[in-house]
Swiss-Prot record:
Membrane topology annotation: Single-pass type I membrane protein
Keywords attached to this entry: AIDS, Apoptosis, Host membrane, Host-virus interaction, Inhibition of host innate immune response by virus, Inhibition of host tetherin by virus, Ion channel, Ion transport, Membrane, Phosphoprotein, Transmembrane, Transmembrane helix, Transport, Viral immunoevasion
Species for this entry: Human immunodeficiency virus type 1 group M subtype B (isolate ARV2/SF2)
Protein name: Protein Vpu
Miscellaneous field: HIV-1 lineages are divided in three main groups, M (for Major), O (for Outlier), and N (for New, or Non-M, Non-O). The vast majority of strains found worldwide belong to the group M. Group O seems to be endemic to and largely confined to Cameroon and neighboring countries in West Central Africa, where these viruses represent a small minority of HIV-1 strains. The group N is represented by a limited number of isolates from Cameroonian persons. The group M is further subdivided in 9 clades or subtypes (A to D, F to H, J and K).
Assigned protein family: Belongs to the HIV-1 VPU protein family.
Record has Ubl conjugation as a keyword: no
A Pfam short name: Vpu
GO cellular component, one term: host cell membrane
Transmembrane segments: 8-28
Extracellular side: 1-7
Phosphoserine: modified positions: 53, 57
Amino acid sequence: MQSLQILAIVSLVVVAIIAIVVWTIVLIEYRKILRQRKIDRLFDRIREKAEDSGNESERDQEELSALVEMGHLAPWDVDDL
């Protein structure tokens, strides 16, 4: 009975560690999706303003360049090589 209790405790710890890792990955991916949506909205605003007025908005371009300069959220996720 003692070894069964130890095995149960060890398995609970392993499951907890796996859950933390999975939810961390989910959070990172969710943040990347939100960031990409923000960039897409800025592109749309710049396109609309360029079509309406003939020139692009400086504030939107600065905001977009600031987002793009933030770099990658995770150093192991480099797809632009």
